[in-house]
């Protein structure tokens, strides 16, 4: 079976994105293959494509930090229970493709009824918000939290985390958008 993916062979603007056809990958031992339904598009991918992201990438590479798709093949030793399940992952590379093979422990089940496009919008955004809160902000239970622009990024904000996690969660927004509250 053939599959398509995007490849970056040299750094630059969008003109360096090349669509190539290859044989579809098959999962190695302990891996699952995901037929990708949705892939996120982020500023980090733009920086990688241009060669200026702090995490250097070896050329050629397939961009795509975050994906959602259906598990359609299991490698030796991987759980067949995941076959047919909707999953999300943060592979950093390889998401701009029809298929990706990843270690089973890098996949997270997407709850039944959640739209794949909505789900993929949460993967990188949520991880980024979580890291900002905990790695940089050292947020801990009982603290007050201010989220700049949080009203419009609810899915990745502390406001969606378990009730009672923070003492108060405050959103800050501009006067221009205050009529939308």
What positions do the PLM features span?
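Conserved hydrophobic/aromatic beta-strand scaffold that supports enzyme active sites
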Residues: 19-24, 68-70, 99-101, 107
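NAD(P)H dinucleotide-binding glycine-rich loop of Rossmann-like/cofactor-binding domains
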Residues: 47, 58, 86-150
């Amino acid at each position: 079976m053939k599959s398509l993916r995007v490849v970056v062979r040299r750094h630059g603007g969008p003109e360096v994105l090349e669509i190539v056809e290859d044989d579809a990958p098959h999962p190695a031992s302990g891996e699952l293959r995901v037929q990708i339904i949705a892939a996120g598009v982020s500023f980090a991918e733009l920086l990688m494509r241009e060669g200026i992201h702090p995490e250097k990438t070896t050329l050629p590479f397939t961009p795509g930090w975050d994906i959602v798709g259906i598990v359609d093949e299991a490698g030796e030793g991987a759980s067949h229970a995941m076959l047919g399940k909707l999953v999300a992952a943060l592979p950093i590379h390889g998401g701009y493709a029809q298929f990706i093979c990843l270690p089973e422990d890098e996949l997270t089940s997407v709850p039944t009824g959640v739209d794949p496009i909505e789900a993929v919008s949460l993967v990188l955004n949520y991880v980024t918000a979580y890291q900002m809160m905990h790695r940089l902000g050292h947020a801990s239970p009982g603290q007050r939290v201010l989220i700049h622009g949080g009203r419009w990024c609810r899915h990745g904000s502390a406001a969606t985390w378990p009730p009672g996690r923070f003492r108060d969660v405050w959103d800050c927004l501009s006067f221009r958008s205050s009529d939308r509250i």
